[in-house]
A protein has these predicted regions:
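N-terminal intrinsically disordered, low-complexity segments enriched in P/E/S/T
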Residues: 1-137
C-alpha cells in the first residue's frame, strides 16, 4: 500500500498547540477499501489500548474536518485534507510519546491548518468499520 506524506498540526482542549509537522502513513480510506470499504452512512471506530475511542463519519475518513488558523484559532476553509494512519513523524518512527506504533493524523500539503487534537488518536490498535449491512475489524 503506498505511503502518503503531509503536514499536520493540532491543538488540545486546554489550548496546547502542536505545530504542524511532516507526517507519513497510509490513507485510512485505502485501508477501508481493503475490506470492502466504508458505506456513505457507515462509521469508522478507531480504538487505542487505553480505552480511548473516536468514531469517524464517512466524510471525515475522506478528509472533512474543521480547520483552524494556527495564530488566531479562527475556523478557516480547507482544501486537501487527508486522514492517515501515521507511523512516521518528521522522518522518524513514532515514539511512545507521539503515539507509537500508529496514530491517526489529519494532514494537508500545506502547514497552514490546525485540527482538533481529539481526532489524533494515539496508540491505535484496532479499527472497526460499521456499515449498515456488515462490520469489519
Amino acid at each position: 500500500m503506498p505511503s502518503v506524506e503531509g503536514l499536520g498540526g493540532f491543538f488540545t482542549t486546554v489550548g496546547v498547540v502542536n505545530d504542524p509537522c511532516r507526517c507519513k502513513g497510509v490513507l485510512v480510506v485505502d485501508l477501508c477499501k481493503q475490506v470492502n470499504g466504508l458505506d456513505r452512512s457507515g462509521t469508522l471506530q478507531v480504538v487505542a489500548p487505553d480505552g480511548y475511542m473516536m468514531v469517524f463519519s464517512h466524510d471525515q475518513v475522506l478528509g472533512d474536518f474543521h480547520t483552524y488558523d494556527p495564530k488566531t484559532f479562527r475556523e478557516v476553509p480547507h482544501d486537501d485534507l487527508n486522514m492517515i494512519l501515521m507511523y512516521e513523524i518528521d522522518g522518524k518512527p513514532l515514539s511512545d510519546h507521539n503515539g507509537k506504533p500508529l496514530r491517526i493524523a489529519i494532514v494537508s500539503s500545506e502547514s497552514r491548518y490546525l485540527t482538533e487534537g481529539h481526532n489524533w488518536v494515539k496508540w491505535v490498535n484496532k479499527m472497526v468499520i460499521r456499515n449498515a449491512s456488515s462490520n469489519f475489524v
